[in-house]
Amino acid sequence: MKSLEEAQKFLEDHHVKYVLAQFVDIHGVAKVKSVPASHLNDILTTGAGFAGGAIWGTGIAPNGPDYMAIGELSTLSLIPWQPGYARLVCDGHVNGKPYEFDTRVVLKQQIARLAEKGWTLYTGLEPEFSLLKKDEHGAVHPFDDSDTLQKPCYDYKGITRHSPFLEKLTESLVEVGLDIYQIDHEDANGQFEINYTYADCLKSADDYIMFKMAASEIANELGIICSFMPKPFSNRPGNGMHMHMSIGDGKKSLFQDDSDPSGLGLSKLAYHFLGGILAHAPALAAVCAPTVNSYKRLVVGRSLSGATWAPAYIAYGNNNRSTLVRIPYGRLELRLPDGSCNPYLATAAVIAAGLDGVARELDPGTGRDDNLYDYSLEQLAEFGIGILPQNLGEALDALEADQVIMDAMGPGLSKEFVELKRMEWVDYMRHVSDWEINRYVQFY
């Protein structure tokens, strides 16, 4: 949409009665206000008002100013699974200015750094999710009782039994402009992935939030729990949000170089950007894998099906899914992020890390073509390959020690993020689990 008049006609033509003024909190969870369509201009000018203190991560006290969500007209779209509704993505404003605690605003700041060089970061985010249900005791299981194969990846029967959900989700997302190009059953029972075409990184993050909104609500209509939780089952692979990326100048990819002697098709710019990602990987873990549960996914070793698919090893390689960064020809795939991350914040942190690598001309070293799951920690250390933090506490330590990533987040947001995540870590460490009760009560 390019004008208010065009947008109003669009809403009238599609019988839209309400517009959801939507943004995300610090956790990447969608927040909305439902606004009658006749007041669209209000969202575009003054914004929809929210009590800032009621939103995670705003840093606004109960006696502080309102958080005003001002819509970006180009993001207006229908919500096909919710007839009569449209969605408008908003940026947070406080006292008339873009708010530095808003993660979409933070991403725009990093995008501006790229724009100064004439660059655009394009990303393709890959959503993995689990379709689940709870039994009468509250325990969680795959929704499909027949989905029990030890190696279920790409299973025909498994994907076919969920076709009502997958088809409605796909059709809804296509209607709002996502170019869905493949759907598959992943390597855990009840786990699926849907891929759609890449976009500039801001639109890509907007699309990912739309995907999660659609998947959760369409599943709910069918009595299914659609979860992006990183590791719902301890003995099965977890849910990632792999981030494919390349930088372009509006004419061509600046990451691709067919003369690359390594055969990976990467330019010097891509290698330096990659060097920055590897150098800042421990701190990136806190932002890209920001929950206690995230680190159940990022363990070293194998699973029942042969691999965890976890990117626990700080290395890169040609089409190597055992490394932190896989190299499909001419681009990077960062395998670290999971479905619990805030895509705006994760992307902003990745840009900051990559640009630091470019500024310092960091060398990522030689790529690894071997299966890193085969090696012990001692062998990996001999190779000079580090591993990611193995719990949220370690990741937060790495984040606080990394001034590049902290600066990219900004002083207020970084402080708020670390404080909230420290609270989560402490709550977890104080919790007495069933595992502990079963193991220790009678033993001692």
UniProtKB/Swiss-Prot annotation:
Biotechnology (record note): Could be used for theanine (N(5)-ethyl-L-glutamine) production, by coupling the reaction with the ATP-regeneration system of yeast sugar fermentation. Theanine occurs naturally in the tea plant (Camellia sinensis) and provides flavor to green tea. It also has several favorable physiological effects on mammals.
Residue ranges annotated for the GS beta-grasp domain, each copy included: 14-97
GO-annotated biological processes: glutamine biosynthetic process
Source domain of life: Bacteria
Known catalytic reactions: methylamine + L-glutamate + ATP = N(5)-methyl-L-glutamine + ADP + phosphate + H(+); ethylamine + L-glutamate + ATP = N(5)-ethyl-L-glutamine + ADP + phosphate + H(+)
GO molecular function, one term: glutamate-methylamine ligase activity
Residues annotated as domain GS catalytic: 103-444
Necessary cofactors: Mg(2+)
Keywords tagged on the record: ATP-binding, Ligase, Magnesium, Nucleotide-binding
Regulation: Formation of theanine is repressed by a high concentration of glutamic acid.
NCBIfam families hit by this protein: gln_synth_III
Recorded family membership: Belongs to the glutamine synthetase family. Type 3 subfamily.
Protein name (Swiss-Prot/TrEMBL): Glutamate--methylamine ligase
Organism: Methylovorus mays
